[in-house]
Regions:
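Alpha-helical transmembrane segments of polytopic membrane transporters and translocases
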Residues: 35-36, 47-64, 93-96, 233, ...
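Alpha-helical transmembrane segments of multi-pass membrane transport and lipid-handling proteins
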Residues: 92-121, 171-172, 179, 278, ...
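Hydrophobic transmembrane helix module of multi-pass membrane transport proteins
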Residues: 12, 57, 96-246
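Membrane-proximal transmembrane or re-entrant/amphipathic helices at the cytosolic face
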Residues: 2-4, 447-494
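Transmembrane helical elements of multi-pass membrane transporters/channels
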Residues: 15-31, 166, 190-197, 201, ...
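Membrane-interface junctions at transmembrane-helix termini in multi-pass inner-membrane proteins
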Residues: 138-162, 349-381, 420
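Helix-loop junctions and terminal segments of transmembrane helices
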Residues: 65-81, 152, 210, 267, ...
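Interhelical loop/hinge segments that connect adjacent transmembrane helices in multipass membrane
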Residues: 1-12, 201-245, 285-302, 423-437, ...
Length: 494
């Protein structure tokens, strides 16, 4: 393999490993924090905090206009040109827009605080706390602006440090305040966490030297218009997903009861949070890298395929392990009473492998700022998911929801691929097809074993498939980036 290709694969692997580690650390800190909060505040306190956060997040989802995601594309594209004036202008526009949208969120929460209190708590007793908390929308949006610059300029180590230190300080500041003030510590803790995050983001982003340029309000509007359009599209996608999730949970509750909702929620969290962290880790570097070359379809094709190969070799072994040992995972993360979610999560594991294939293509639509196309694709995907899930649950219960999840991503994968093929002459490399295809077949094999066998035979055959998946993954990584030499060099440096 050529030096350039090896370097490219190593860069992808390093970024994925870096942010994968950060994701794991975030989850561990969140678990520890949740335990402390549960003990110190009790169920009522946790409920109050959750209602505050839900109300604020609802407004933030609308007022932020998706800038935290969409602006990364513009900063990355400017950075890819190495034009210092363009970089400076783009960063300045982003920083102005986050002030405007942050102030908008603050004003909306402050003005609607009586309504938020009434809707969230059923009374007006929490109007003043909502007014005080409105400042967090401005602070969080300013933090998001600094993270956009770090991600867009591909200062990945600084972004990782900022994230890791942020959750650490969140834990360190929260526990003493909750211990000292109890429920009364919720508002000051939420504000202090936001302030800590902003300070950390500012300390790291200020390391990036950007020229001082004058940008008029008209220039801000002109250059920011595309960011806002794409950002609103991303926000709408999130709103579609929220609506579908609400309708689906209501349907499950009406037909199966609240326990069924809990089982579905537990399985959904495992897939999106714990398994989904691989995709979150990949996306942090993949998105700005793809955005920087979005005008070159050939380079985009190569980048998507290379990213897909690395991701498949990491995700495949992870999903085969989950399929075989999911009952133990459910017991560790929840309890024996959640074992009924096993069939749902089993089918959803197949869905996650299919989702990854579609996901790496769908980033092309965002990187190329195809806002209308992105909205159509995401809206159709949500419609598919709702229809498949309602029918699946109606006829097969919780297992049907898992089957629906897998079926959704078969259709979504084909849809994304055909659109990208027609618009950008996109096609996967033979290397990706071979690598992804083998790992997908191993996931299907594991699913079949889990469905057909039980007891020691299931674990014997399942472990054999896991071993094959791991062997092929490690061998594939070693072939592409000389993994063993890479690891040895890292250890030697330490």
């Amino acid at each position: 393999m050529s030096k350039n290709n090896q370097s490219s694969y190593r860069s992808i692997f390093k970024a994925t490993s870096l942010f994968g580690g950060v994701q794991v650390y975030q989850i561990l800190i969140q678990i520890i924090k949740s335990k402390f909060v549960a003990v110190l505040l009790g169920p009522a306190g946790v409920g109050i905090m959750g209602l505050f956060q839900s109300g604020l997040q609802l407004v933030q989802q609308i007022s932020s206009m998706g800038l935290a995601q969409s602006a990364v594309r513009d900063v990355s594209e400017a950075n890819g040109t190495n034009d210092l004036q363009r970089i400076a202008k783009t960063v300045t526009v982003v920083r102005k827009l986050v002030w405007i949208t942050g102030l908008l969120g603050l004003i909306v929460v402050a003005c609607c605080s009586p309504l938020l209190s009434k809707v969230s708590f059923g009374n007006y007793d929490y109007t003043i706390p909502f007014i005080i908390l409105s400042i967090t929308l401005l602070i969080d949006q300013l933090s998001a602006g600094q993270r956009v610059v770090l991600q867009g300029m591909r200062r990945l180590k600084d972004l990782a440090k900022c994230t890791a230190f942020g959750v650490t300080f969140g834990l360190i500041t929260s526990v003493p305040l909750y211990y000292w003030l109890g429920v009364d510590g919720i508002v000051p803790t939420l504000i202090l966490n936001s302030v800590c995050s902003l300070i950390l983001c500012w300390l790291y982003s200020r390391k990036i030297k950007v020229e001082i340029v004058q940008v008029t309000p008209m220039q801000t509007f002109e250059q920011g218009k595309q960011m806002l359009i794409m950002g609103i599209s991303l926000s709408l996608s999130g709103i579609f997903s929220t609506i579908v999730a609400y309708v689906l949970r209501s349907f499950i509750q009406g037909n199966g009861g609240v326990e069924e909702v809990g089982l579905y929620q537990a399985g959904f969290v495992i897939m999106t949070t714990y398994v989904g962290m691989v995709m979150n880790a990949i996306g942090t570097d993949y998105y700005p890298r793809l955005a920087a070359i979005n005008k070159d379809n050939i380079e985009c094709r190569e980048t998507v395929s290379k990213q897909g190969e690395i991701g498949a070799m990491i995700l495949g072994p992870m999903l085969t392990f989950c399929l075989v040992f999911m009952p133990f995972v459910l017991q560790i993360l929840y309890s024996d009473s959640f074992l009924a979610a096993n069939d749902y999560v089993t089918w959803a594991c197949l869905g996650m492998m299919l989702r990854f294939g579609a996901w790496i293509i769908s980033y092309l639509f965002v990187a190329k700022a195809e806002s209308k196309l992105f909205i159509k694709v995401e809206l159709s995907a949500n419609v598919y998911y709702l229809v498949f899930s309602l029918l699946g649950y109606r006829f097969f219960g919780l297992s049907g929801l898992g089957i629906a999840f897998a079926l959704l991503y078969v259709v979504y994968f084909l849809q994304c691929y055909l659109i990208a093929r027609k618009r950008y002459d996109f096609r996967f490399s033979h290397s990706f097809i071979k690598c992804y295809g083998v790992q997908l077949l191993l996931v299907v094999a594991c699913l079949t074993i889990v469905m057909l066998f039980d007891g020691w035979l299931k674990y014997l055959l399942g472990c054999a498939v896991i071993a094959i998946s791991c062997f092929l993954g490690i061998r594939g990584l070693n072939q592409r980036m000389n993994l063993l030499s890479f690891v040895k060099n890292k250890i030697a440096k330490k």
